[in-house]
Structure formats: structure tokens, C-alpha cells
């Protein structure tokens, strides 16, 4: 599965990894924080976006 984010043109990942959506809990943001990052375990989430965690499915 190859999927890319909107930053694919300005962000490069190591070989075998893709740019994916990531969600992480951030107390500073008082909740879930959305970000992008490189990961090798992508799966296709909503709107054909690349996700790195199951949280992307909601």
C-alpha cells in the first residue's frame, strides 16, 4: 500500500516508508493532536488518506 500526504513534495521518508497521518495524545493540546510522520506500517483510512494508527479510522 502506497499512500502519500499533502506534504509529500516537501517531506522525504527513508526507503520503505511513507508519509502517513499520525494521531497522538497531547496534554498540552488538551486532547488528540494531529500530525504527519514517516512510518512503514501504513493503511488506508478515510478519504483515502494514509494512516499509521487505528485512530485514523474514526
Curated annotation (Swiss-Prot):
Question: Matching InterPro entries, A to Z?
Answer: Snake_3FTx (IPR003571), Snake_toxin-like_sf (IPR045860), Toxin_cobra-type (IPR054131)
Cystine residue pairs:
3-20, 13-38, 42-50, 51-56
Superkingdom assignment? Eukaryota
**CDD domains (UniProt xref):** TFP_snake_toxin
Q: Name one GO cellular component term.
A: extracellular region
- Write out the entry's keywords from A to Z: Acetylcholine receptor inhibiting toxin, Disulfide bond, Ion channel impairing toxin, Neurotoxin, Postsynaptic neurotoxin, Secreted, Toxin
Q: Pfam families per the record?
A: Toxin_cobra-type
Q: Which SUPFAM superfamilies match?
A: Snake toxin-like
**What family does the Swiss-Prot or TrEMBL record give for this protein?**
Belongs to the three-finger toxin family. Short-chain subfamily.
> What does the UniProt function comment say about this protein?
Produces peripheral paralysis by blocking neuromuscular transmission at the postsynaptic site. Binds to and inhibits the endogenous nicotinic acetylcholine receptors (nAChR) in the human rhabdomyosarcoma TE 671 cell line with an IC(50) of 266 mM. Not toxic to mice by intraperitoneal injection or to zebrafish by injection at the back dorsolateral region.
Name of protein = Short neurotoxin MS11
**Organism of derivation:** Micrurus surinamensis (Surinam coral snake)
The organism's taxonomic lineage, starting at the top: Eukaryota, Metazoa, Chordata, Craniata, Vertebrata
Amino acid at each position: 500500500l502506497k499512500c502519500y500526504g499533502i506534504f509529500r513534495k516537501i517531506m522525504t521518508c527513508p526507503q520503505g516508508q511513507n508519509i502517513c497521518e499520525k494521531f497522538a495524545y497531547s496534554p498540552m493540546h488538551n486532547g488528540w493532536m494531529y500530525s504527519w510522520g514517516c512510518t512503514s506500517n501504513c493503511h488506508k483510512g478515510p478519504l483515502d488518506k494514509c494512516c499509521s494508527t487505528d485512530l485514523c479510522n474514526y
